[in-house]
Amino acid sequence: MKNELNGLIVPSITPFNADYSVNLDRIETLAAFFKDNGIKGAFICGTSGESLSLTTEERMAITTRWVEVAPEDFSVLVHVGHNSLVAAQALAAQAQKAGAWGIGAHSPTFFKPNNADALVDYCAQIAASAPKLPFYYYHIPGATGVSINIIDFLRAARGRLPNLCGIKFTSPNMMEYQLCREFDDGKYDVLFGIDS
């Protein structure tokens, strides 16, 4: 699948109320602010969005709200990764039903895949739950503890992950990043962003 995001995509925060509940109303303000500042899309419920601190229901509500208030021509890319494969599949299916532009998922962070084939198996089961959406593997080894070589992952994904369109590359390994960009004649969209 060749879909490509264009322009600046922001890894959005999740707004909270003083009582730590999610403030769904503020999402519209964020979306308008991003659009007014030339941002072309948002990666929601990722690490900046505190996904692993949220319940599955909260993440679904955030996805629904973002899709409802997203400006025209604004891409909503939803992180659906979870330590529970069943929860990740439910998040993926809900993102597709809500009308998100695409989904992404990082590896499990507790019972971790130990090779590229196992990681592809995990991602394929999530991506199959939203087969109409572009899927990005969220490579963030500093947070997940999974540092499987991404070129090995891309090779293993051939024919097994049909809606894989790219990598959200969150690692300081610039050599690996460049190899990803060049892999299969630039077939995959490789989004780069890392906090320092």
Briefly describe each language-model feature range:
Residues 2-146:
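Active-site beta->alpha loop and helix N-cap motifs at the rims of alpha/beta catalytic domains
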Residues 127-131, 140-196:
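Catalytic alpha/beta core domains of metabolic enzymes, predominantly
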